[in-house]
From Swiss-Prot:
Induction: TGFB1 inhibits TM4SF20 expression to activate CREB3L1. It comes from the Eukaryota. The first transmembrane helix plays a critical role for the insertion orientation in the endoplasmic reticulum membrane. It is linked to Specific language impairment 5: A disorder characterized by a delay in early speech acquisition. It is usually associated with cerebral white matter abnormalities on brain MRI. Some individuals may show disorders in communication, consistent with autism spectrum disorder, or global developmental delay, although others ultimately show normal cognitive function. Penetrance is incomplete and expressivity is variable. Glycosylated at Asn-132, Asn-148 and Asn-163 in presence of ceramide which inverts the orientation of TM4SF20 in membranes exposing these residues to the endoplasmic reticulum lumen. Cleaved by signal peptidase at Ser-14 but the peptide does not act as a signal peptide. Cleavage is inhibited by ceramide which inverts the orientation of TM4SF20 in membranes exposing the N-terminus to the cytosol and not to the endoplasmic reticulum lumen. Expressed in the brain, with high levels in the parietal lobe, hippocampus, pons, white matter and cerebellum. It comes from Homo sapiens (Human). Changing L15P: No effect on cleavage of the first 13 residues. The record marks F13, S14 as: Cleavage. This is Transmembrane 4 L6 family member 20. The gene is TM4SF20.
Length: 229
């Protein structure tokens, strides 16, 4: 087995695990909404799970590269130069899907759950448009909706000081499922942080398979031993 085949096998199994993890993470808020309200879209935790970053971005778009990487490994049906090339080509789709998953996850972590932005907590306030991704600014990525005691907009006119923010950050360790708001914040933060990590790892494995696939196509794969009768 050449190093290209071994690395392709590693990439294939890693992408398979990340693919399944992305689908499961994306499904968590959908299932919670179904269990709570007996409807999928009546009062969602956030708008962003309906962009399906884990099911489509990290899931469906990673299937071609995952399948070809697993079939291009040693003793598999596509263990040849063509299989290596196709695994590299399909990995481009994986990288695009992973980047989509990352961008949606970053936007979700920036905005917070729907309860923090809309008192009605209704999907009528969801705007499904990719142009919102261009509005991401690093200075606004402070996760105050998660670290503050409450993510509801303040009623007073006093701006929170840095000491108040730090104190709220220390109090965040006392999060429990004692209210619907805390539950939505914890689920939202955990799901989209997990999807962000899944997207980052899929980008790394996808880029590595692009390189390894081209090397395997150029250098060839190990020959199968002829069967002795």
């Amino acid at each position: 087995m050449t190093c290209c085949e071994g690395w392709t096998s590693c990439n294939g199994f890693s992408l398979l695990v990340l693919l399944l993890l992305g689908v499961v993470l994306n499904a968590i808020p959908l299932i919670v909404s179904l269990v709570e309200e007996d409807q999928f879209s009546q009062n969602p935790i956030s708008c962003f799970e309906w962009w399906f970053p884990g099911i489509i971005g990290a899931g469906l778009m990673a299937i071609p590269a995952t399948t070809m990487s697993l079939t291009a490994r040693k003793r598999a049906c596509c263990n040849n130069r063509t299989g290596m090339f196709l695994s590299s080509l399909f990995s481009v789709i994986t990288v695009i899907g992973a980047l989509y998953c990352m961008l949606i996850s970053i936007q979700a972590l920036l905005k917070g759950p729907l309860m923090c932005n809309s008192p009605s907590n209704s999907n009528a306030n969801c705007e499904f448009s990719l142009k919102n991704i261009s509005d991401i600014h690093p200075e606004s990525f402070n996760l105050q909706w998660f670290f503050n005691d409450s993510c509801a907009p303040p009623t007073g006119f006093n701006k929170p000081t840095s000491n108040d923010t730090m104190a709220s950050g220390w109090r965040a360790s006392s999060f429990h499922f004692d209210s619907e708001e805390n539950k939505h914040r914890l689920i939202h933060f955990s799901v989209f942080l997990g999807l962000l990590l899944v997207g980052i790892l899929e980008v790394l494995f996808g880029l590595s398979q692009i390189v390894i696939g081209f090397l395997g196509c150029l250098c060839g794969v190990s020959k199968r031993r002829s069967q002795i009768v």
